[in-house]
């Protein structure tokens, strides 16, 4: 069992041999790459020699996606389009920040923003691209720029990928309410790998994160207000949405 780790401060990528580390009671690490820039907004290890990176443009108005490494190929058109998103000069670049993860099953990447109402799914080989919008229309970045920061929406938190589907925590509250006293219970939205909605799990606790034990068909959520974890039987939902 291995884990590839990106050091945010140095840009170095190392591979940790987890089993050897446990057996030897020390970190067993191998340097895979020492030439990536520090401070990347996103990093995904595609392989031991190819890395998906998202880096700020020099003027801090865009976040540029690219592949780095020995055998990195050309970018598909979908990434070029995503790289066109930008904020105005001196505006908050985090408006277009996303959390990106890649499925090892189908090699599709999901990018979940924290302040926009749409999520992008795409493959690096260019054979699939889709945008999932939770709302009547896509958020306009320029309109969000014009709002005071406290009035901007906190849309999603936590992104989890599974074999047959993926999910996010939907917050949907403005930042002031979220920071000073949440009022709306969040929900967990589940989608298949083509972006089709599968289920909405409505919660009665103020959670920011979740995970699903697929073997025991159990949903785990963490309540940020009382530092407690809760478990729910998810067998009925999973029996409907998971292929045998």
Which role fits each region the language model picked out?
Residues 5-13, 19, 66-75, 123-134, ...:
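Short loop/turn segments immediately following beta-strands, especially the blade-tip
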Residues 31-48, 92-107, 112, 151-162, ...:
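Structural signature of eukaryotic scaffold interfaces centered on beta-propeller domains
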Residues 2, 6-53:
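Asp-box/WD-like beta-propeller blade repeats and closely related beta-sheet repeat scaffolds
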Residues 211-244:
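Blade-level signature of beta-propeller repeat domains, shared across WD40, Kelch, NHL, RCC1
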Residues 3-10, 60-71, 181-196, 236:
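Beta-propeller blade signature
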Residues 48-58, 164, 168-184, 229-234:
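Short, conserved, GDST-rich strand-edge loop motifs in beta-rich repeat architectures
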Residues 15-35, 71-96, 125, 129-151, ...:
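Surface-exposed loop and turn segments in beta-propeller and other repeat-based domains
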